[in-house]
Amino acid sequence: MKTTTVTPNLIQLTRLGFVNAFLVREDDGFTLVDTTTGGAADKLIEAAKAAGGAIRRIALTHGHGDHVGSLDALEGKLGVEVLMPELDARIHAGEKVVDRKLTGSWPKLETVPGVRLNAGDRVGSLEVIAAPGHSPGHVAFLDARDRTLIAGDTYTTIGSTQVSNHFYWRFPLAAMATFDKAQDLESAQALRALNPAVLVVGHGPAVRDPGAAMDRAIAKAR
């Protein structure tokens, strides 16, 4: 697992070369945002220890398998609070919350989130931002300390910055897993309006001063 210090408050953890999770530094340790694919639990725990802290909570941008893949194993090892977007948590609980077929991978989870996230909620230093489209309940997280935006899969940055509603030939082909492409574009525009200082995403490297790159991505996605 590759470890990249993006800001003093955020460490990007990359598994298999293209799937990211994030350690967000707080006074009591780390918030882990997303868990990558299955089999990563020990590596994620080790990365937090190597960075000088422990994982105190797990917050998820959405419920797809490449973001919740190691959730059950981590919860079993750590017993920490798990926070998942409201609609995606309801989907994982077996509720029918949409009227058409879901896209992306929705693995069966044993973990029941203790908190269902909605726009405006806080997770330590992170503000929850509604960003539906890639999944029905997808959220992003904005760090109030330095305006780092954890955009989940609303954008990808492998090769270049793209909105996930727009088909782009580079793996992981996020458009194929995007539930509502029009809504995803609206969310991408809303995230751009936040004027983040740094953009980090579920797939691809961090982008500093990302405004121009986000603008180009939105223009291509329209």
Which residues make up each language-model segment?
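Binuclear metal-ion centers of metallo-dependent hydrolases, dominated by the metallo-beta-lactamase
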Residues: 208-222
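Divalent metal-coordination and catalytic microenvironments
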Residues: 9, 24, 34, 44, ...
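Residue-level marker for buried hydrophobic side chains located in beta-strands
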Residues: 31-33, 59, 82, 148-150, ...
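Metallo-beta-lactamase
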Residues: 38, 127-130, 136-212
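Conserved beta-strand hairpin/beta-sheet module of binuclear metal-dependent hydrolase folds
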Residues: 1-50, 141-153, 157
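Active-site HxH/HxHxD metal-binding segment of metal-dependent hydrolases
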Residues: 40-42, 46-123, 219
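Short, flexible loop segments at the rims of nucleotide/cofactor-binding pockets, characterized by
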Residues: 8-13, 35-37, 58-61, 126-129, ...
